[in-house]
């Protein structure tokens, strides 16, 4: 009886799937499966919408343990694109992004809170215009699985809002235009 129980335990251990661990992914910007867009109120009447065309990053993620996730993103602020060349020149100036001095923005996660059903709050250090402050991103796991090319992918969306003045942007466009909304779409390819 003891031998049968021992054999069953050993067999069960050997046949049981190993505990899942976080997988590492690279953000698929080159395949145009990721985007960083922004929206700022234009004097309270409408919105200026734009994007950053050049960014890179990676993340670790395990759906069974989202709190262990890690995210690192670098954004080339020179790549700002609001579909208006003169406005983009102004956004790159010292009035806003000061890209001559700070050509890169970064986000490095410090914690992830699992809200259930794929929802998370990813908190990290966001550096923009030479200023680093904590920033929380409301994120959602869209899905994951095999792709047709033999790889494995995981996708997420995220949103966050920050005040321009918190990052040393002193241009005052009025209270309706004080905040920037970021919308993130991220698809990663497992390394």
Swiss-Prot record:
It comes from Shewanella sp. (strain MR-7). The keyword Signal applies. The keyword Signal applies. Residues 1-22 form the signal peptide. This is UPF0312 protein Shewmr7_1249. HAMAP family: UPF0312. SUPFAM superfamilies: YceI-like. NCBIfam families: PRK03757.1. GO terms for cellular component: periplasmic space. It comes from the Bacteria. PANTHER family: PROTEIN YCEI. Its main location: periplasm. It is found in: Periplasm. Keywords: Periplasm, Signal. SMART domains: YceI. Belongs to the UPF0312 family. Type 1 subfamily. Gene3D superfamilies: Lipid/polyisoprenoid-binding, YceI-like. InterPro entries: Lipid/polyisoprenoid-bd_YceI, TTHA0802/YceI-like_sf, UPF0312/YceI. Pfam families: YceI.
